Amino acid sequence: MYAVIKHGGKQYKVSVGDVLELDRIEGAEPKSSIELNEVLLVKGDDTKIGAPTVEGAKVVAEVINNARGKKVIIFKKRRRKDSRKKRGFRRDFTRVVIKEIVA
């Protein structure tokens, strides 16, 4: 059984036991449980497709930790103009493990 969920403007295909890195969820403590209610599709014995979401479906996940991703360097240069910009970016994310899919 798997489900397609929407979180943070992205879609994820998840099954029970999958580990995901979602955009930072404020107030999510490690070992706490969260519910993801924007379920777009559930596939098991039968398929349920939402319009836009499946009514009554949810995905239960357990928070593993909150962390920051690797640094990404953004470097812009205009040739012959002595113009340079260097910026760094680190993504904040919440790592979760999928515990249950309720259809």
UniProtKB/Swiss-Prot annotation:
Give the UniProt record's GO annotations in the biological process aspect.
translation
Q: Which domain of life is it from?
A: Bacteria
Q: Which UniProt keywords apply?
A: Ribonucleoprotein, Ribosomal protein, RNA-binding, rRNA-binding
> Does this UniProt record's set of keywords contain RNA-binding?
yes
What GO MF terms are annotated? rRNA binding; structural constituent of ribosome
- Output the Pfam families linked to this UniProt entry: Ribosomal_L21p
Q: What's any one GO cellular component for it?
A: ribonucleoprotein complex
InterPro entries, per database record = bL21-like (IPR028909), bL21-like_sf (IPR036164), Ribosomal_bL21 (IPR001787), Ribosomal_bL21_CS (IPR018258)
The UniProt family comment states: Belongs to the bacterial ribosomal protein bL21 family.
Q: What does this protein do?
A: This protein binds to 23S rRNA in the presence of protein L20.
Give the multimer and partner information.
Answer: Part of the 50S ribosomal subunit. Contacts protein L20.
- In Swiss-Prot or TrEMBL terms, this protein is called Large ribosomal subunit protein bL21
Species, as recorded: Nautilia profundicola (strain ATCC BAA-1463 / DSM 18972 / AmH)
